């Protein structure tokens, strides 16, 4: 009887002990899981924080400085004068942004191919470098409202003016700057034309003047300015492709800065600010004739520019439809 009682007591004690061990194990596992979960959440938060390369509007204001990417060699849009000061149409606008924001401006010299990269890495807060709005670029950066109209153009020597791209021979080259809409447009629509690409405006200009290419394709505002300032050259193709716009750009997702810039552009439009900008920086190059064509006030593209773009789109659609109809007719004739 005593032996049986002792066995029962030992069995009960052992069961309780094993239960306590099991509970301790569960508690330990639960604690480990909780700690792991907290670590994971902290890592995710840290990763998310690290992925934000841009500075918000408030952060810029708190720092007292803003970094704006501009060209340093593209007169009259962005260039450094003989006194080492930044000047030009884009710079005039940038100075106004800094003034109204109440911060110091740090100008950062950029090339066409670096504009997206500088925003993606947070090297600059805004790009104001003759930046044409395109769907491809809009996937990587956020564009604000436009402040200028633009199309593509082609300049060539007066002795051999290129008035149509079909005049370019198979062994001849067209000069473009890497990262520009001219490069993208020609590669997509004229893949047979050989392109000589350069990273900077200065090297492209020098190469063109040395006869490396039979023509230079760029924004029409730039090639027109080039032909006016350099004797012996003519813009044989003043408008190529569709009518586009120039706009400021910020890092993808920087909504606070983007909204402020849009509001600023709308407010400046009420003052005809961009006409004043044109007359201060561009009129010596283009004269009064181009002012209404190029300037966009308050982020609103004029009806004339919109109509021109619409007309070009309609013409392209009509040409495409005619071509398709002719092709269908040929196939039908062959079938007979």
Question: Locations of the language-model features?
Answer:
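Bacterial lipoprotein signal-peptidase II cleavage site
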Residues: 22-37
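Extracytoplasmic small-molecule ligand-binding "clamshell" domains
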Residues: 34, 39, 46-130
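Ligand-binding clefts/hinges and TM-proximal coupling segments of bilobed small-molecule sensing domains
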Residues: 49-51, 181-198, 235-239, 265-310
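Periplasmic-binding protein-like
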Residues: 149-156, 224-265, 284-304
């Amino acid at each position: 009887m005593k032996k049986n009682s002792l066995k029962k007591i030992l069995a009960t004690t052992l069961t309780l002990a094993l239960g306590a061990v099991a509970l301790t194990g569960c508690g330990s596992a639960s604690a480990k899981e909780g700690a792991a979960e907290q670590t994971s959440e902290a890592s995710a938060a840290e990763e998310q924080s690290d992925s934000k390369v841009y500075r918000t509007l408030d952060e810029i204001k708190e720092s007292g400085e803003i970094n704006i990417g501009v060209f340093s060699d593209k007169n009259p849009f962005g260039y450094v004068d003989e006194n080492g000061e930044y000047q030009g149409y884009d710079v005039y606008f940038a100075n106004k942004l800094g003034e109204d924001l109440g911060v110091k401006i740090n100008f950062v010299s950029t090339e066409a191919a670096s504009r997206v990269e500088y925003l993606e890495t947070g090297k600059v807060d805004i790009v104001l470098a003759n930046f044409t709005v395109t769907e491809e670029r809009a996937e990587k950066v956020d564009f604000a409202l436009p402040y200028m109209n633009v199309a593509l153009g082609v300049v060539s020597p007066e002795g051999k003016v290129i008035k149509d791209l079909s005049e370019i021979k198979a062994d001849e080259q067209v000069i473009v700057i890497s990262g520009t809409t001219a490069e993208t447009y020609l590669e997509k629509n004229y893949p047979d034309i050989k392109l000589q690409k350069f990273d900077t405006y200065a090297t492209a200009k020098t190469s063109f003047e040395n006869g490396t290419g039979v023509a230079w394709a760029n924004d029409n505002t730039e090639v027109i300015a080039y032909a006016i300032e350099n004797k012996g050259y003519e813009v044989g193709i003043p408008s190529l492709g569709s009518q586009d716009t120039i706009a400021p750009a910020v890092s993808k997702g920087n909504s606070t800065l983007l909204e402020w810039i849009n509001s600023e552009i709308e407010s400046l439009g009420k003052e005809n600010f961009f006409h004043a900008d044109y007359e201060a920086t561009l009129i010596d190059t283009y004269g009064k004739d181009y002012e209404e064509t190029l300037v966009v006030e308050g982020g609103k593209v004029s009806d004339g520019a919109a109509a021109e773009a619409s007309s070009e789109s309609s013409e392209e659609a009509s040409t495409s439809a005619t071509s398709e109809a002719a092709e269908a007719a040929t196939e039908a004739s062959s079938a007979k």
